[in-house]
Amino acid sequence: MGGGGQLGESGENGCKSAAGVYTWEEVQHHSNRNDQWLVIDRKVYNVTQWAKRHPGGFRVLNHYAGEDATEAFTAFHPDIKFVQKYMKPLLVGELAATEPSQDQDKNAALIQDFHTLRQQAESEGLFQARPLFFLLHLGHILLLEALALLMVWHWGTGWLQTLLCAVMLATAQSQAGWLQHDFGHLSVFKKSRWNHLVHKFVIGHLKGASANWWNHRHFQHHAKPNIFKKDPDINMVDLFVLGETQPVEYGIKKIKNMPYNHQHKYFFLVAPPLLIPVFYNYNIMMTMITRRDYVDLSWAMTFYIRYMLCYVPVYGLFGSLALMMFARFLESHWFVWVTQMSHLPMDIDNDKRRDWLSMQLQATCNIEKSFFNDWFSGHLNFQIEHHLFPRMPRHNYHLVAPQVQTLCEKHGIPYEVKTLWKGMVDVVRALKKSGDLWLDAYLHK
């Protein structure tokens, strides 16, 4: 799903029909890491070599190898015509006239209806951003950081001031997380290069993280949400079992890396407090170093240098590090609950190769709209709309939501909206249900 590449790969991979015309069966043979074909608008592309240079990461392309990637391609790329120019060297043919446009017996009527909805949203200007909206969000992040610093510089470093400072820093970090998400999805500026530049500033300078790390991880999540071996957000490194399939598989195989029937209890001790300050911090830094991503590493270092210059004079080195870790400890709770309540209680399974609309609705739910919920979640309380239209500016999610709901009702697809409290409670309930399934399979199967 990008541009540029090498021609001449197709002949070595076999299955080539006369005049570059292929059946779905032939395309599906090219579905491993060393041999990747995909279909976009009935045209067949060999992306085996290009995958290594794909700006969104090689894994995203691999996840769609042997499949129709039209809907994902459209969802992720803001300038389709521009990208298509660079795809020409990758073209190896097209589908035979007798072949359907969709693979895996997908519902053509549903796909067409969703395509019509996307076109309608574009014609209504729902993919156009309001710069002032994002400027104000950036402004309130910078204001929170400035107030936190001024407070301890002026009133000292007592326990109350330190606690308030940590809360303000955690709030700024959380809101910066939602803001970098906007730029990372290319949903603010018309030019991708400006989105990329500001993304590096927000995630690098304001948060000390890596834009490339986020891109390669997050686009996989959007491409195949809640799908094992494809969505990194559900790779729980054997700490948890999720959904209804994995627990039974682990139970039957007698895998007991953790007491999974108690995972809904130890979740509170592991995921919310440790995800950002421990796992993400380590993973991000190691990724930048091992991949020699010196650009992102330089951006991240500006965050740490700025932070130390601001806080070491008042807290000392150890105190400054402790304050940073405590702020990230608070931020981690915020981040985990917001992100998990929209996904973890939903369907988590192996890849069923569904159409875009069905796949996203199986994996996502919404949280009720309110001023607080919008701000608290970075408008990801409209997780359904965000997953269907990842490039849409978040201030327009609520405008397209009624049309999405109508389309779902037409095709009998559940469209779930919860209260904030129920969304959080359902995370724990889902973990308990999966843990119980594991225990039953472990003991009786």
From Swiss-Prot:
<dbReference type="Pfam" id="PF00173">
    <property type="entry name" value="Cyt-b5"/>
</dbReference>
<feature type="transmembrane region" description="Helical">
    <location>
        <begin position="132"/>
        <end position="152"/>
    </location>
</feature>
<dbReference type="GO" id="GO:0062076">
    <property type="term" value="F:acyl-CoA (8-3)-desaturase activity"/>
</dbReference>
<keyword id="KW-0560">Oxidoreductase</keyword>
<feature type="transmembrane region" description="Helical">
    <location>
        <begin position="307"/>
        <end position="327"/>
    </location>
</feature>
<dbReference type="GO" id="GO:0016020">
    <property type="term" value="C:membrane"/>
</dbReference>
<protein>
    <recommendedName>
        <fullName>Acyl-CoA Delta-4 desaturase</fullName>
        <ecNumber>1.14.19.44</ecNumber>
    </recommendedName>
</protein>
<keyword id="KW-0275">Fatty acid biosynthesis</keyword>
<keyword id="KW-0444">Lipid biosynthesis</keyword>
<dbReference type="Pfam" id="PF00487">
    <property type="entry name" value="FA_desaturase"/>
</dbReference>
<keyword id="KW-0472">Membrane</keyword>
<keyword id="KW-0443">Lipid metabolism</keyword>
<dbReference type="InterPro" id="IPR001199">
    <property type="entry name" value="Cyt_B5-like_heme/steroid-bd"/>
</dbReference>
<dbReference type="GO" id="GO:0006636">
    <property type="term" value="P:unsaturated fatty acid biosynthetic process"/>
</dbReference>
<keyword id="KW-0276">Fatty acid metabolism</keyword>
<dbReference type="InterPro" id="IPR005804">
    <property type="entry name" value="FA_desaturase_dom"/>
</dbReference>
<keyword id="KW-1133">Transmembrane helix</keyword>
<comment type="similarity">
    <text>Belongs to the fatty acid desaturase type 1 family.</text>
</comment>
<keyword id="KW-0812">Transmembrane</keyword>
<comment type="function">
    <text>Fatty acid desaturase with bifunctional delta-4 and delta-5 activities. Component of a lipid metabolic pathway that catalyzes the biosynthesis of polyunsaturated fatty acids (PUFA) with preference toward n-3 substrates and Delta(4)function.</text>
</comment>
<comment type="pathway">
    <text>Lipid metabolism; polyunsaturated fatty acid biosynthesis.</text>
</comment>
<feature type="transmembrane region" description="Helical">
    <location>
        <begin position="266"/>
        <end position="286"/>
    </location>
</feature>
<dbReference type="InterPro" id="IPR012171">
    <property type="entry name" value="Fatty_acid_desaturase"/>
</dbReference>
<feature type="transmembrane region" description="Helical">
    <location>
        <begin position="153"/>
        <end position="173"/>
    </location>
</feature>
<feature type="domain" description="Cytochrome b5 heme-binding">
    <location>
        <begin position="19"/>
        <end position="96"/>
    </location>
</feature>
<dbReference type="InterPro" id="IPR036400">
    <property type="entry name" value="Cyt_B5-like_heme/steroid_sf"/>
</dbReference>
